[in-house]
Amino acid sequence: MTDDYELLDSGDGRKLERFGRYVLARPCSQAMWRPAKSAAEWAKADASFDREDGNNWHGRANLPKEWQIETAGVRFKLGGTDFGHLGIFPEQRAQWRWIRQRVGEVVSGQRPRSEDAAGTVLPRVLNLFA
């Protein structure tokens, strides 16, 4: 299973993450410790988001408007928002794995399933996060 997400470092109220081929530095208020990587490593990020600087992306031109990654066996379409989010929260990966497993069980016939008028299998999942 491919995992295009990686937490590279965190500290000083920020996190350094890899989403596919792009490395991003974003705020993380819980990261109150010192980062393990050097400032030079953090400076290599393709883009960074800063709340102290008026909620601005720096280097946003280095990112495509949208791109896809796969993590926890699920493919996601990402894009930077004006408030520093990308459209997913990687800390939810355990839930995505669970959802993927349940959908697989429905599709394979291991769990009860419903079908639409055309006979297409319709797994039913309600993810109330966010």
Q: What spans do the regions from the language model cover?
A:
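Non-catalytic substrate-recognition/targeting regions of SAM-dependent transferases
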Residues: 2-17, 24-90, 97-100
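Single, functionally critical "micro-switch" positions that shape active/binding sites
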Residues: 19-20, 128
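Serine/threonine-rich low-complexity intrinsically disordered regions
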Residues: 38, 95, 113-117
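Short, structured patches in soluble enzyme cores that scaffold and shape functional sites
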Residues: 80, 129-130
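Mid-sequence acidic-hydrophobic segments that form the walls
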Residues: 98, 102-106, 128
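Intrinsic disorder/low-complexity segments
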Residues: 105-121
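Conserved class I S-adenosyl-L-methionine
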Residues: 121-129
